[in-house]
C-alpha cells in the first residue's frame, strides 16, 4: 500500500481533536503528500456508519445498559474491523493518507490498562480487527492526569471520560508504556495549542520530507 496511516493518541483532554483539525488544513498544503493523494479524516470509535452506532452504544448506552468490560472490548474490536475494512485499507490502497483520532493503542490503554483486561487477548483481537495493519506514524499527545481532569471538568463527558482518577492514571501509564514499546512520537500536550501544532508539523516533515524528495 502506498498511502499513509497517521494516528493521534492520548488521554482525555490532550487536544487530539484540535490538532486533527489543524492537520486537516496543513497537511494537504505541506508538500508532503504525493500529487493526487487525498487526506481522509476519521476517528475511533465512529469512523463508519456502523461505527457511529457502536460508538453510541459504548459511550452513551441507553438507561442502565452499560456494557461489561469484555463486551465493551468486543464492541471496540467490531468498530475497528469495520473501520479498517471499509475506510482505512481501501484509502491506503489508493495511495491516500488517513489521519485518525485514536486507533488500536487506545484500546490497549483504556481496556487493557484502564479496565485491567488481559493484554494478550486485546493484542490478539487487535491483529484480527486490523488484519495486521500498523500505523505509519503515531503521535502520543502526553498530558498529566491532573491537567486532563482540569480540562475534562470544563466540558461534558461521555461514559468513559467520566471514569475516576485511578482509572485515568492506569490509562496514562498504559499510554506511556505503549509509546515506548511501539516507538510513538511523544509530544508535550500541556503547551500552547500553536506550539503543539508546530511540533507536529516538524515531526511530519522529518519523517516524510526525505521520502518526498526521493520520489522527485
UniProtKB/Swiss-Prot annotation:
Biological process according to GO: dTDP biosynthetic process; dTTP biosynthetic process; dUDP biosynthetic process
GO cellular component terms, A-Z: cytosol
UniProt keyword annotations, A-Z: ATP-binding, Kinase, Nucleotide biosynthesis, Nucleotide-binding, Transferase
Catalytic activity: dTMP + ATP = dTDP + ADP
Enzyme class (EC, first level): transferase
InterPro entries per the UniProt record, alphabetical: P-loop_NTPase, Thymidylate_kin-like_dom, Thymidylate_kin_CS, Thymidylate_kinase
Chain sites annotated for binding ATP: 10-17
GO molecular function term, any single one: dTMP kinase activity
Transmembrane segments: none
EC number annotated for this UniProt entry: 2.7.4.9
Pfam family of the protein (one): Thymidylate_kin
Family, per entry: Belongs to the thymidylate kinase family.
Biological role: Phosphorylation of dTMP to form dTDP in both de novo and salvage pathways of dTTP synthesis.
NCBIfam families: DTMP_kinase
Name the record gives this protein: Thymidylate kinase
Underlying gene: tmk
